Amino acid sequence: MNKILVAYDGGDPARRALETAAELAKLTGASVAVVSVVPTHPGRFPVDPSDDTSVHAQELLEARRMLREKGIEAELIEPTGDPAPTIERIADEGGYDTVVIGSRGLNAMGRILQGSVSEHVATHSKATVVVAR
């Protein structure tokens, strides 16, 4: 394990993913990057992605602070797009061998209606995917 990508959105599942990534990095000496995707919202009305940028920037800074408290430096990545395929693309193009992502614990209906980012990444990424619960 050389490169860990952790998906982070500030929620409790993402915090658990960050903790898991920190533990793995300490055990293996792997480098860590944190990605927080600014989602684009398809629909009838255009949404300005810059509206979400400051929120995601704050989430990334929070993640960096949490990792620094554990003695880990991290690269911060803030792309825009659909979160699931964007995380998958960054992991694959960046050569990350491990992706750590939180699980929201959606029930079957929630997965059908909303989709599951962790399920998509685990199914499609070339990297090993660790789902923190």
Tell me the role of every PLM-derived stretch:
Residues 89-133:
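Gly/Ser-rich helix-loop-strand patches that form or flank binding pockets
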Residues 33, 75, 130:
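Conserved beta-strand positions in the Rossmann-like core of class I SAM-dependent methyltransferases
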Residues 61-68:
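Class I S-adenosyl-L-methionine
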Residues 68-99:
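Structural beta-alpha unit
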Residues 2-50, 70-72:
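Small/aliphatic-rich secondary-structure junction motif
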Residues 50-61:
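Short, surface-exposed alpha-helical segments at coil->helix boundaries
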Residues 41-42, 84, 108:
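Generic structural signal for helix capping and beta-alpha/helix-loop junctions
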Residues 17, 21, 63, 87, ...:
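Aromatic/hydrophobic pocket-lining residues that form π-stacking "cages" and hydrophobic walls in ligand
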